[in-house]
Amino acid sequence: VCGGLGGVMEEACRGAKSAGGITVGILPGVDRGYANPYVDIVIATGLGEARNVLVVKSCLSVIAIEGGYGTLSEIAFALRAGVRVVGLNTWEMNIAASTKYVDEIIRVSNAREAVDEALLGMVSRS
């Protein structure tokens, strides 16, 4: 499950397909044609960035790779929902003068480690 567009989302779908997986793209717009070519199931929401909540709520683990504010919002939604977040060169949660919020992202150094850590989270939550 991912946002279904290009870039990292497309590469995630390509990797999943090459391993025999089924891919789901939850698009921000209403035009299904914007889905990357590796998406099997297209969900065109028309929700804009609000679709990030649907992406996170559909997952047992989230892998965050680099990313902009959309990725940051997905990380925040996941942490708030108790969904395991695995990070590869992504945001760091440094909140000044706060002991309540800590960086709960599991840091990895390559894609294989990211998938392995995400799968651990799926096993523990299923």
Residue ranges and their predicted role:
Residues G3-V83, W91-N94:
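Acidic/glycine-enriched connector segments
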Residues V42-G46, L88, D103-E117:
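Short acidic-hydrophobic, aromatic-tinged amphipathic segments that line or gate anion-handling sites
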